[in-house]
């Protein structure tokens, strides 16, 4: 699934979009951008709130890149461009809150750590905060996160 732009909310240049397999094979959409500056300050990993999506953060992504940060954003399972667990795609559902924890660990191990420069910072809104601050995501990032 491509990112969606509007005239007032364009996609920041240089995006790399992909999917990783979450727990149970659920496709999880992510996007990442390199820093717009040669002087790099690390990577900001954005973890949206409930019912949010990558596109909501385009303005934030642009500002962070202009300040020398790479950015990686994850769409939660059941939200944004990620896979759904219900037939009705308008309903968000997760079998266990621990699935979010597993998704963050996979996102860090497969997307952020291999392809984005350290140190790693978490920028989380609402539901994103408890999901990225639980023990497994922090352990997946190791001593390289969260600053």
Give residue spans per PLM region:
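An N-terminal hydrophobic leader/cap segment in hydrolases
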Residues: 1-21, 28-36, 122
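Short glycine-enriched nucleophile-adjacent loop
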Residues: 129-140
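Active-site glycine-rich loops that stabilize anionic/oxyanionic intermediates
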Residues: 47-52
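Alpha/beta-hydrolase active-site loop
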Residues: 92-112
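Conserved alpha/beta-hydrolase
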Residues: 61-87
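Alpha/beta-hydrolase fold nucleophile elbow
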Residues: 114-126
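A conserved short beta-strand
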Residues: 141-147
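Proline/glycine-enriched tight loop/beta-turn segments at coil->beta junctions
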Residues: 25-26, 35-43, 118
